[in-house]
């Protein structure tokens, strides 16, 4: 059980979670929840990432997830982390298989092209074409071997920092205080099995779930709304949330 959970239990769920202190000095699990236009959570909301803050100023991120919020019902923080870890690993091997299949198709197409060109004769032009095709085949085989030998490695914890600011792009929430978290996550490259380190900035402000715990299938969550996500349309909501006990009073931003 995290230190935050211990504190909440001792206070009967009545203590507010102090941010950013709870992220930097306590061992706890948070998650990104996408709930579209609705202002209430439901079991079909998507958990797109799970974060383990270690209480030492670091965070371990499992991104690219596609979990239903209802899948977390009745689970504790450790079990939620295990779900995230398993799906993150499955995504690695799914990506590996997709790349293998894609490269196999490309290699087969080049082999057929090579046979077709070879049948054109033995001119200098044909030999040049075959040479270029062979070079492409060699390059693709190297890529295929790199994919084939790739093995899963768990992501690493990264330092997290924060600042406070105001969110001024929303006319209804102009000058509202926001907490800005900055840290790095590891994501798979689209065309290889390499993990890329990407810097993430989360702009968090008070939203629908700051003051009171919202219930989904017997589990309760509080959180802050994430503002300014790329590609978001108006009314498309994402929240940065954690698991709490029933009756919990929510979150308090402390500068």
Regions found by a protein language model. Give the residues of each.
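C-terminal motif of bacterial Sec signal peptides marking the signal peptidase cleavage site
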Residues: 7-10
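Long, solvent-exposed N-terminal ectodomains/accessory regions
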Residues: 49-54
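Short, low-complexity, Pro/Ser/Thr/Gly-rich segments in the mature regions of secreted, periplasmic
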Residues: 241-255
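Short, solvent-exposed loop/turn elements at domain surfaces
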Residues: 16, 35-44
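Contiguous, well-ordered beta-strand patches that form the walls/edges
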Residues: 40-46, 58-231
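N-terminal helix-cap/turn-to-beta initiation motif at the start of protein domains
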Residues: 14-31
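Short, exposed beta-strand-loop hairpins at the edges of beta-sheets
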Residues: 229-243
């Amino acid at each position: 059980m995290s230190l935050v959970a211990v504190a909440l239990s001792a206070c009967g769920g009545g203590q507010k979670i102090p941010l950013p202190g709870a992220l930097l000095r306590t061992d706890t699990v948070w998650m990104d929840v996408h709930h579209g236009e609705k202002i209430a959570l439901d079991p079909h909301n998507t958990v797109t990432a799970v974060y383990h803050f270690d209480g030492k100023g670091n965070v371990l991120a499992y991104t690219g997830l596609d979990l239903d919020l209802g899948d977390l019902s009745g689970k504790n923080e450790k079990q939620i982390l295990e779900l995230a870890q398993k799906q993150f690993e499955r995504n690695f091997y799914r990506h590996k298989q997709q790349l293998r299949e894609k490269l196999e198709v490309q290699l087969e197409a080049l082999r057929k092209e090579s046979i077709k060109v070879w049948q054109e004769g033995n001119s200098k032009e044909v030999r040049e074409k075959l040479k270029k095709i062979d070079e492409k085949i060699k390059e693709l085989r190297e890529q295929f071997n790199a994919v084939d030998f790739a093995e899963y490695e768990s992501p690493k914890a990264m330092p997290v920092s924060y600042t406070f600011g105001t969110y001024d792009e929303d006319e209804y929430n102009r000058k509202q205080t926001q907490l800005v978290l900055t840290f790095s996550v590891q994501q798979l490259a689209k065309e290889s099995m390499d993990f890329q380190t990407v810097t993430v900035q989360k702009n968090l402000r008070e939203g629908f779930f700051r003051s009171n715990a919202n219930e989904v299938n017997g589990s309760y969550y509080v959180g802050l709304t994430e503002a300014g996500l790329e590609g978001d349309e108006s009314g498309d909501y994402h929240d940065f949330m954690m698991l709490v006990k029933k009756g919990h009073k929510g979150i308090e931003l402390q500068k």
